[in-house]
UniProtKB/Swiss-Prot annotation:
GO terms for cellular component: extracellular region. Its cofactor is Ca(2+). It comes from Opisthacanthus cayaporum. Keywords: Calcium, Hydrolase, Lipid degradation, Lipid metabolism, Metal-binding, Secreted. Residues 18-27 have a biased composition (Basic and acidic residues). The lineage of its organism: Eukaryota, Metazoa, Ecdysozoa, Arthropoda, Chelicerata. This is Phospholipase A2 2.
Amino acid sequence: FMKVIDPGTKWCGPGNKAADDTDNGKN
C-alpha cells in the first residue's frame, strides 16, 4: 500500500505504517 509522500513522511509499509499514521493522522 503506497500513497503520496508528505513532507517528512515515507512510503507506507509493513515496517513504518504505524509511524506513518502518526505523522499524518491518517492512512
